[in-house]
From Swiss-Prot:
Group of enzyme by EC: ligase
Family under the similarity heading: Belongs to the NAD-dependent DNA ligase family. LigB subfamily.
Species of origin: Salmonella agona (strain SL483)
Gene3D superfamilies: 5' to 3' exonuclease, C-terminal subdomain (1.10.150.20), DNA ligase/mRNA capping enzyme (3.30.470.30), Helix hairpin bin (1.10.287.610), Nucleic acid-binding proteins (2.40.50.140)
Cited InterPro entries: DNA_ligase_AS, DNA_ligase_B, DNA_ligase_CS, DNAligase_adenylation, DNAligase_N, NA-bd_OB-fold, NAD_dep_DNA_ligaseB, NAD_DNA_ligase_OB
Molecular-function annotations in GO: DNA ligase (NAD+) activity
Keywords for the protein's UniProt record, in alphabetical order: DNA damage, DNA repair, DNA replication, Ligase, NAD
UniProt name for this protein: DNA ligase B
Length: 561
């Protein structure tokens, strides 16, 4: 498939501001796009926290929230109103504020953050819903949703129905405030293979609904903070375990450097765990007194999240490719994203009909993942731009019998045919990829797919972009091609048969091939009636007949009299 580059449409220009990619929108459009995305996130947020229903995947919501912040910064807009927290319906004050956790982008950032800090531990970043548990006189008296970090919903009645959460405590925990994550209990969850499963939304839904007491049996608790607890981390973990919060001790490791953090992160990513995770949290054993905790100011802990299995990517252009068979395929060019250490900047959408059904235009946000063998795959459209400027696809008159000869409308299928004939399935012209064929055709204006046979060594050497060594190699390859078998030349002409079928036919000349009947072709391996008819159509095509005579004049084996 070759790109129909002349049909590319609506490319969005981008510039860098403070390290972020910014769309080059006029101010009015920027304001409109930001307002629309902000409203959509607010609507999803409201549904999520009021109804316990997720209208969009957790990862998609997080990435679009980050995209909104990026756009706001690009235009110098205040980002404080970004709807990343639940609507503030709850009025129950937290005894100790939830600080949140700073996100670190990569290992280098982890190394920098760890520098100068001591007594560090790493824990899995459990994916669920944050909560405050308040124990007084040995009894659970309050449970409060995270809310905005300072106050939240009173979840006490629901939390008391979760069997895995201790209702009574003793000793130092008899009067204590704990912060943790309510999670969906899993058996043998391998994050790398099973993904996030929208666990956060499922937990929120269970806690919001009024008619699902039995579902709460599937929830667990991971305590990640005991404000004003024992200063000694092993003692803190031991007391939590004795009180029934055993997971914290089991999944807390001492770390001295970023390498140890990375090993733990990779281990938890690939090992069977009892919960869904989305990264790791590194924390100092020594914490400030709880009276100093404030939302967004927890500098004694940081998170290193796993890369998402799917990335939200901005469509920068829509392009069309025409293959040697005439099939038109739509390709979306993307503002590059990283998936599994691979830089992804384009994704195949499929046919024109499929593209129209997806309704994708430049400026849209799409979810992209990697399919088998690391091939980018379109999963869904998660956000559509207000402006819907779409390109017009090329005419659909192309087929398997068009564009053996060059013309303005045949440019891309013609190039596809050149790439095919140079492949190992045909003439095996080593070193001849799409770029080389384009350079030769643009310079020497081929009449048809075999015009390169008439090029001299001097002409090849004078082709822009061809170094001396490369031009000599191509000259040798072109000369060697003259000695290729008749079967390979027929394959280069795109006969609609497999090489195995051609070998079984036993034809060694064009004259023999012309004498074959449709019945003969039907009997060949993997052929049948339909393909046999296509062979007859191919053989009788005027362009194919003309090419066969031209090859005969060039003394190509099998085409002479």
């Amino acid at each position: 498939m070759r790109l129909w580059k002349s049909m590319a449409w609506g490319i969005l220009l981008w510039h860098s501001q403070s390290g972020a990619l910014c769309p080059a929108w006029p101010p009015a459009r920027a304001a409109e796009e930001i307002a629309r995305l902000q409203q959509q996130l607010a609507d999803w947020n409201d549904i999520y926290w009021k109804q316990g229903v997720s209208a969009v995947d957790d990862s998609v919501y997080d990435q679009l929230s980050a995209r909104l912040v990026q756009w706001q910064r690009c235009v110098g807009q205040d980002v404080s109103s970004t709807p990343v927290s639940p609507p503030l319906n709850g009025t129950t004050m937290h005894p100790v504020a939830h600080t949140g956790v700073r996100k670190l982008a990569d290992r280098q950032a982890v190394e920098q953050w760890m520098r100068g800090r001591s007594e560090l531990w790493v824990q899995p970043k459990v994916d669920g819903v944050a909560v405050t548990l308040v124990y007084q006189n040995g009894k659970l008296t309050r449970a409060i949703s995270r809310g905005n970090g300072l106050q939240g919903e009173d979840w006490t009645p629901k939390i008391r129905l979760i069997p895995s959460i201790p209702q009574t405590t003793q000793g130092a925990l008899a009067n204590a405030v704990l912060q943790g994550e309510i999670f969906l209990q899993r058996e043998g969850h391998i994050q790398q293979r099973m993904g996030g499963m929208n666990a956060r939304s499922k937990v929120a839904g269970m806690l919001m609904r009024q008619d699902n007491a039995s579902a709460l049996n599937s929830l667990g608790i991971f305590i990640w903070a005991w404000p004003d607890g024992p200063a000694n981390m092993p003692e803190r973990l031991s007391q939590l375990a004795k009180a029934g919060f055993s997971l914290t001790k089991k999944y807390s490791l001492v770390v001295k450097d970023a390498s140890e953090v990375e090993r733990a992160r990779q281990s938890w990513l690939t090992s069977a765990l009892p919960f869904v995770t989305d990264g790791v949290v590194i924390r100092m054993a020594k914490e400030p007194a709880s009276q100093y905790w404030r939302p967004g100011q927890g500098d004694w802990l940081a998170a290193w999240k796993y890369p998402p299995v799917a990335q939200v990517a901005q469509v920068s252009a829509i392009q069309f490719s025409v293959g040697k068979s005439g099939k038109i395929t739509v390709v979306a060019s993307l503002v590059p994203v990283i998936l599994d250490d691979k830089r992804v900047q384009r994704v195949n959408i499929g046919s024109v009909k499929r593209w129209e059904a997806w309704d994708i235009a430049p400026g849209d946000q799409i979810l992209v993942s990697l399919a088998g063998q690391g091939i980018p795959r379109l999963d869904e459209v998660v956000w559509r731009s207000r402006e819907r400027s779409k390109p017009v696809p090329p005419d659909s008159h192309f087929n398997s019998l068009t564009c053996f000869y060059a013309s303005a409308t045949c440019q891309e299928q013609f190039i596809s045919r050149l790439v095919w004939l140079g492949s190992r399935s045909a003439l095996g012209l080593d070193g001849m990829g799409e770029a080389s064929w384009r350079a030769l055709h643009q310079t020497h204006r081929f009449e048809h797919i075999f015009s390169w046979l008439t090029l001299t060594s001097a002409q090849i050497a004078n082709t822009p972009g061809f170094a001396k060594g490369k031009s000599e190699q191509i000259w040798r390859q072109f000369n060697l091609a003259r000695r290729q078998s008749f079967t390979r030349w027929i394959m280069a002409m795109d006969i609609p048969l497999t090489q195995a079928a051609l070998q079984a036919s036993g034809d060694r000349s064009w004259e023999q091939l012309l004498m074959r009947t449709e019945q003969h072709w039907r009997q060949l391996p993997a052929t049948g009636e339909r393909r046999a008819g296509r062979v007859i159509d191919w053989r009788n095509n005027p362009q194919i007949k003309t090419l066969s005579r031209w090859l005969a004049a060039q003394h190509i084996p099998g085409f002479g009299s």
